């Protein structure tokens, strides 16, 4: 993909790339949007998009809506860490950036962190310190590894910093808040014009589900159907293609109270989220967005890295194998009073200041 007349190559020739940000998935792109715009304004920054979540539709939806463009698109279309790293190294060895930023716990982030160490760049890990304390979760293993090799760590909360200290990671650790706050609040203000085309009930619950352990097994999908059929409320479900294909493959039909719609762009999704009564999800990012927009959340997993949302009683865990009715938990959470957002304000601006201090 050639973007901005391939400015990355132009910057390489001028030898002015000081900071490279690496991203490859929807959550990373969303959360990094405001920070990337600020870094681009400094004139010494390049964004590498790995294509871990690759599709022309996703790129156009997210990059156009979020007003950012990758300087280089690797089009890897894979989640294999070794392949992602090798593709990055082709360009990082040429650029030799002094600093590399990675976000969160994706395979793109892990590959970027490993590549940074290989080329000798200073590694900054944004969203450091999240822990679910279950090593069977691939993201848990990734974030532990990334944190262990990072030169600077930006945990979003004091609790995340505490988790790092348990692992004896105390040097160059700064609590920054969560970048999702800036993007979510800014775009929620304009989301209505992107959601007007939906024909939705006045009151509805929102459902998102994409994790492999939930959507790839017939038994889990049958459990989902059973739980959803016991809920009296209408449920709007922007259905992930993987989930849709597996439902069809197993011959499982959604109950009548579920309104399945096409996958939503980010602004469309914010419209659905801000107008719902409650969201059910297995997404870490949606747990964060829900509390920012003061929407109760039920997380369809047995663990969560977003402890703050659980401690504030804005979120509750409900793994699909539970025998008690999901409907009972829904009714309880509909009365949840969400009084504050634990993730800070003006996070991108604060983070830019910290990055400037590191790179000077």
Language model region names:
Residues 2-51:
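N-terminal subdomain of nucleotide-sugar transferases
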Residues 102-103, 110, 114, 125-126, ...:
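A donor-sugar binding/catalytic signature common to diverse glycosyltransferases
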Residues 63, 159, 314-360:
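Leloir-type glycosyltransferase catalytic cores
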Residues 20-23, 28-38, 62, 73-168:
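Active-site and donor-binding regions of nucleotide-sugar-utilizing enzymes
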Residues 2-8, 52-57, 75-76, 146-215:
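A nucleotide-sugar donor-handling region in carbohydrate enzymes
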Residues 44-83:
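Conserved nucleotide-sugar phosphate-binding/catalytic loop shared by glycosyltransferases and other
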Residues 73-76, 155, 174-176, 259-262, ...:
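Short acidic-hydrophobic, aromatic-tinged amphipathic segments that line or gate anion-handling sites
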Residues 55, 59-62, 191-275:
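Donor-nucleotide binding loops and adjacent catalytic segments primarily
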